[in-house]
C-alpha cells in the first residue's frame, strides 16, 4: 500500500449534447489516443441509430443497458496458507459503473458489424433487453461468485 494520500477523484463534466455525467464517462472510455471528437461522433451516432430503430429515448436505453451489465458481486483472489481462494466480494458502486462501461465497450468492439457505431448500437440494444456479450460476462461473474460462496468467510 502507498504511504501517500489517495489520489483525488477528478471531476468529469457532463457531456455537451445530453448533459449526462455517466454518458460523459462512457465517451471518455470510448476515446482512443485523446480523440474525443471522434468518440463523441461514434456515441452520438449510435444514439441516433437507436432513436431511429426503436423510437425510444437513447439515453434511457443506454442507462437500461448499463444497469443490466453492472455486476453486484465479483471474486477476488485471497491467499491463505499456501492456497489461493477465489473469494466473492460485493462491488463498490463506482467500480460497478466502471466495469459496466468497460464491458459494454469491450464487447461492442468484438462484434462483427462493420462500423463502431453499428457495433455500439447493437450492444446497447442487446444489453437493454438482457442479451449480448456484456450481459453474459456479468452473469458469468455472478456465477463464479455463487460457486465460491463457501469461501466468503475469507472476506477482508
UniProtKB/Swiss-Prot annotation:
Record-linked InterPro entries: Ribosomal_uS7 (IPR000235), Ribosomal_uS7_bac/org-type (IPR005717), Ribosomal_uS7_CS (IPR020606), Ribosomal_uS7_dom (IPR023798), Ribosomal_uS7_dom_sf (IPR036823)
Domain of life (superkingdom): Bacteria
Pfam families, per the entry: Ribosomal_S7 (PF00177)
Presence of the UniProt keyword S-adenosyl-L-methionine in the record: no
Signal peptide start-end: none
Record's keyword annotation contains Ion transport: no
SUPFAM superfamilies: Ribosomal protein S7
Alphabetized PROSITE patterns for the sequence: RIBOSOMAL_S7
GO molecular function terms noted in the UniProt entry: rRNA binding; structural constituent of ribosome; tRNA binding
Any one cellular-component term (Gene Ontology): small ribosomal subunit
One GO term of the biological process aspect: translation
Keywords on record: Ribonucleoprotein, Ribosomal protein, RNA-binding, rRNA-binding, tRNA-binding
Function: One of the primary rRNA binding proteins, it binds directly to 16S rRNA where it nucleates assembly of the head domain of the 30S subunit. Is located at the subunit interface close to the decoding center, probably blocks exit of the E-site tRNA.
NCBIfam families, per database record: rpsG_bact
Subunit details: Part of the 30S ribosomal subunit. Contacts proteins S9 and S11.
Membership in a protein family: Belongs to the universal ribosomal protein uS7 family.
This protein's name: Small ribosomal subunit protein uS7
Lineage, highest ranks first: Bacteria, Pseudomonadati, Pseudomonadota, Alphaproteobacteria, Rhodospirillales
Gene that encodes the chain: rpsG
Amino acid at each position: 500500500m502507498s504511504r501517500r494520500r489517495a489520489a483525488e477523484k477528478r471531476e468529469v463534466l457532463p457531456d455537451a449534447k445530453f448533459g449526462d455525467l455517466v454518458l460523459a464517462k462512457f465517451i471518455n472510455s470510448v476515446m482512443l489516443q485523446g480523440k474525443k471528437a471522434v468518440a463523441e461522433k461514434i456515441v452520438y451516432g449510435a444514439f441516433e441509430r437507436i432513436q431511429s430503430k426503436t423510437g425510444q429515448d437513447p439515453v434511457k436505453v443506454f442507462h437500461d443497458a448499463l444497469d443490466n451489465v453492472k455486476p453486484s458481486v465479483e471474486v477476488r483472489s485471497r491467499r491463505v496458507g499456501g492456497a489461493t481462494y477465489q473469494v466473492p466480494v460485493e462491488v463498490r458502486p463506482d467500480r460497478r459503473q466502471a466495469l459496466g462501461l468497460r464491458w459494454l465497450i469491450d464487447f461492442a468492439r468484438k462484434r462483427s458489424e462493420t462500423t463502431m457505431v453499428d457495433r455500439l448500437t447493437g450492444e446497447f440494444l442487446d444489453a437493454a433487453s438482457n442479451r449480448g456479450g456484456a450481459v453474459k460476462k456479468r452473469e458469468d461473474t455472478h456465477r463464479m461468485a455463487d460457486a465460491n460462496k463457501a469461501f466468503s468467510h475469507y472476506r477482508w
